[in-house]
Every structure is written in C-alpha cells, then in structure tokens.
Amino acid sequence: MATPRADCGSCLPEEELPMSGTLGALDGRIAAAPISWGICEVPGWGEMMPSERVLGEMRELGLPATELGAPGFLPEAEPELSELLGRYGLAMIGGFVPLVLHDPAQRADALARATAVAKLFQAAGGTRFVTALVQDYDWSTPVPPTADDMKIVGEGLREVDAICAAHGLVQVLHPHVGTIVETAADVALALEHTDVAWCLDTGHLQIGGVDPVAFAKEYGHRVGHVHLKDVDVATADRVVSGELTLLQGVQAGMFRALGTGDVAIDDAVVALEESGYQGWYVLEQDIALTTGLPAEGTGPIDDVRACLDCLRTTVVPRLP
C-alpha cells in the first residue's frame, strides 16, 4: 500500500482515490470544505444538507479530505468522527477555530477552547488549526486593532502555537471578513507583530484589499494552508461599504466557483507553488441554500465540480 503524502498531512493513499481527471502537481492536495455545500452555523444562513449527502458528494468528486465544518455538522468526539469520515474514504484536515486573543482577560478561556479543539483534531488525524481572530464569540463588528493590540494578539498566538505543536498540529492565521484581521491595514499589522503561519484565503484577502497573488509572492514562506475562493468584487464592495452584511453578500453570490469571479486564482497557485508550498488547497466557496435542498446530484456539487475543472484546465497546465 502506498503511504500518505507527508506534505499534505493525512492524505489517503493514492491508489484508494477515485480518479476523475489528472490534477498534475496538485493531485492528492485538493480538499473539501463543508461551507461549499452551505454548511454554516450562522442563524438564518440557509438550508443545511444532511452530512451523509455532503460527504458522499465529496467522495464522488474524488476529494480525499475535508475540514471539520460548522459545529454540529460532523461528530465532535472520537471515534465517531473518524468512523463517519472513514465510511466515505475521507481524511480530516482540521478546521476553522474562532478565538478571542486581543483581550488578556479572556486569554485563559481562549486557550481552553484551543486545547479542546486541538485534542479533537489530533485524535481524528488532522494537521491544521485555522485560527480566526474574532472580536467576540457572537461575531460582533470588529474594532480595528492598534499595533499594541496586535502585539497582545501575537503573544496569544504563540501560546496557541504551543498547544498545537503539542498535538501535532500547525496553527495558521485566517484573514477573514468580520474579524480583527479583515483589512489590508489589519493584515499588515498581523504580519509585523506576529510570527504565526498563515492560511492564504484568496477570497477574504481580495475583499480586504490585499492582492492574494502579491501576498503569495512576498509571504509564501509563511503560508501553511490555503483556501481557494473566487469573488465577485462588485458584490464584495457592497459588503465592505456596509450596504450588505456578510450573510447578505453570500446570499447574493459574492463567492463564486473558481474561474467565474475576479480573483486571479491561477496566478495565486502558481506563485505559491513557486514559493515551495506543498500543502493543501481547500476549495471553499461559501454558499447559502435559500430555496430548499437541491435535487440529488445537483446544487453545490456542480459548483465544486466546476472548481475542479477550472484547476485542471486553467491552473495545472501552468505548473511544472
């Protein structure tokens, strides 16, 4: 039996993966995110698809692994989580973890949350702990951080790094709309005052005013994980201006299948590969199902399939 690829964490052996067309240098490195199927914990987000259908569609597309997704979508205990994923031939990468680290009074609580999640990820074979720096756990509108705030955050991130290392994980910082690392100014402060690895999210960087291609070229050495997300900039601008909430923007189609938005996905991947990046690329097109569940074999699976087709036809031919 082939051994899992060390550069991707817990990839499945290649001969166990369904082949749906070559991805060249990206074979075995493209993974799924439940949000691409509309799975989100935000009240009023939309219809939630059953986990068995989502996992089955991931497997049908030949995706070898997934992030955890919203609370309640997958079991949050072992061995239940690994057993469920195993039925669909999927490995666990890790997942998205909101933490409050700018307030020293909440540090102990944040570290306790981080430890609990790290234990779950480790037990399930995960390798990536994706930190989002929220204002609070209700996702209140963030207060733009100062340099002093970010120095405090940096101290907290180092403590989370230690927790992750003790559980065989790599922490990556996720710039994200609605967090304290949202805008180009926030990203610059975080780069200057923290030494954490990064999750390069092409969509959220673009929305925040950061060119993801330039980020990949300049900071590729700090990238430990990647979310591939395309964006309709016109809709994103309405979110940034406050005309639309993030949820309204998603429901209006702000995030698009790869190759149908305004992000230079191919240039970003090429820059990352040239920087030496060897990790996962997670397909993450946030959607909201607002008109009920789609018929079997239709709906989100079509968009994810289109993302894979984009990688095969547009990105892979540009890679060595």
Where are these regions (language model features)?
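Acidic/histidine-rich catalytic cores of soluble enzymes
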Residues: 32, 65-66, 154-262, 315-318
